[in-house]
Amino acid sequence: MTEEQRGVPLSELSLQQLGELQKNCEQELTFFQDSFNALKALLSRNEKSISALEDVKVGTAGHTALIPLSESLYIRAELSDPNKHMVEIGTGYFVELDREKAKGIFDRKKEHIAKQVETVEGILKEKRRTRAYISDAFQTKVQAQLANMNTQQS
């Protein structure tokens, strides 16, 4: 037996319920916005990795360069073989790959992250739309109560 889910019209909710719903929607929106920003940053870092891979392509053995360990920390390193690259394959695991395989990994990561960005972007649009509906219902309910109070006082 499956239970069919049905929504409750916003007009039937009390101001308190609408306020709670609005608060929950804002929290979800914040969560998805943070996720979106994190994914965009990850996509940017992946692009930098692809760019660095291309920069090393023109290097020769024995060439020295500054290698970023973080956004603000660099070390001087000597390129021993311009065709071999250390690539992080997940949670701190690195593997040595040739340029083409490394580029393949970066391209797959880019594609995967781009799909995730697209998904979260769609969710964000829907959450913003939901927030607008809830806000409109809240305003309508407040105006109706104010009008009701004014007619009772008259």
Curated annotation (Swiss-Prot):
The keyword Chaperone applies. One of its GO terms (biological process) is RNA polymerase III assembly. GO terms for cellular component: cytoplasm; prefoldin complex. The keyword Glycosyltransferase does not apply. GO terms for molecular function: unfolded protein binding. Signal peptide: none annotated. Keywords: Chaperone. Belongs to the prefoldin subunit alpha family. Heterohexamer of two PFD-alpha type and four PFD-beta type subunits. Binds specifically to cytosolic chaperonin (c-CPN) and transfers target proteins to it. Binds to nascent polypeptide chain and promotes folding in an environment in which there are many competing pathways for nonnative proteins. This is Probable prefoldin subunit 5.
